Amino acid sequence: MKRRVLSGVLASSVLAASSLVAMSTVSGASVQLTKVNFVYDFPGPDMEITPIVAAQQQGYFASQGLKVNIIFPPDTSTSSQMLTTGAANIGFITTSDMAVAVQAKAPLLSVANYSMSNNWGLFAKPGSKLTLANLKGKKLFSWGDTWTNAMLPFVVKKAGLKMSDITVVTASNDMPLLLAGKIDWTTSTSNYGVPGIFGATGKNPVAITGAAAGVPNVPVWVYATTKSYASAHASVVKAFLKAVLEGTKYASAHQSAAAAAFTKAYPKSGYTAAYNKLGWSLTVPLLTNAKGKYFVQTDAQWSLLDQGLVATKQIKTAPTPSTYYSNAYLPAQ
């Protein structure tokens, strides 16, 4: 779902993350800060981490008594494992990661939504005549992540096909393959797919997303921890989310400045300043629900996701929604 970056970039990203931690502790040098290891969902930084950067640089974490260390996992399948093993305390994962983990009896708990709707789908080159009606026999790109694996069966079902009717191509970068015509569609969310293709071509892509792609309208990303960590460190989880809420509000109200701050914090992320600015501007509308609230989860979102995953045979049974989440740690809004 997200563009991968080279290992050399990842090394610089880790160094950049360390410098962010250092900046957040300067103003609170005389105060004992509680360390929180935060694991991202991807091996390198991208613009969706902008609220965390804002919370660091604006001092929101420090004001809540926290020293947050950002960790980038070795691959897209490890963040949940790092939470369950204690290598990370709080993480950023997809709702499908949660569903798969809970099905495997992992003790994860989603404590806040990041986004509120499903903006994932298929993206083709500008001017393409491709539609779901002619999807059969086409080559679709996948990052090999849990979310893409979970969503593709919905797409082929919408098209009246089976997974065997398409070819799934997995590689480290989608754009060269798309531009060279070696794949017909790439898969992504609109806040990544649009700036990626626009940056490469100067034009907006042909896109089929959300309901048009047949995917359930559920949040894509959540903040998660383990049930044991949430129980033993409830005040830390609450403080973290309060700081992240402030960071999210700041980054939403100051979009250009926040995107520029991310670019400056991670100059070797592999993304351009223009990409980060456009990507973040497309992310902001996804962060609040119909009532303008951040973070709030519902039984309905988890039930809808489970119904789809059971129907497409990706999980065997659907647990009760309360198995997945709690709103008990959310700050007042």
Where do the language-model regions lie?
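Short, surface-exposed acidic
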Residues: M163-I166, K268-G279, K316-T323
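Predominant activation on well-ordered alpha-helical scaffold segments within soluble catalytic domains
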Residues: S24, V53, A99, P153, ...
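Secondary-structure end/capping motifs
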Residues: A232-T312
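Short, glycine-/small- and polar/acidic-enriched structural segments
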Residues: S30-A180, D184-N191, V206-I208, N217
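Short, low-complexity disordered leader/linker segments with a strong preference
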Residues: M1-K35, A332-Q333
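Surface-exposed patches in mature extracellular/periplasmic domains of secreted proteins
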Residues: I70-I71, S110, V168, A251-F262, ...
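Conserved C-terminal helix/tail region of periplasmic/extracytoplasmic solute-binding proteins
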Residues: W302-Q333
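Pocket-lining segment of extracytoplasmic ligand-binding domains
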Residues: S96, D174-K268
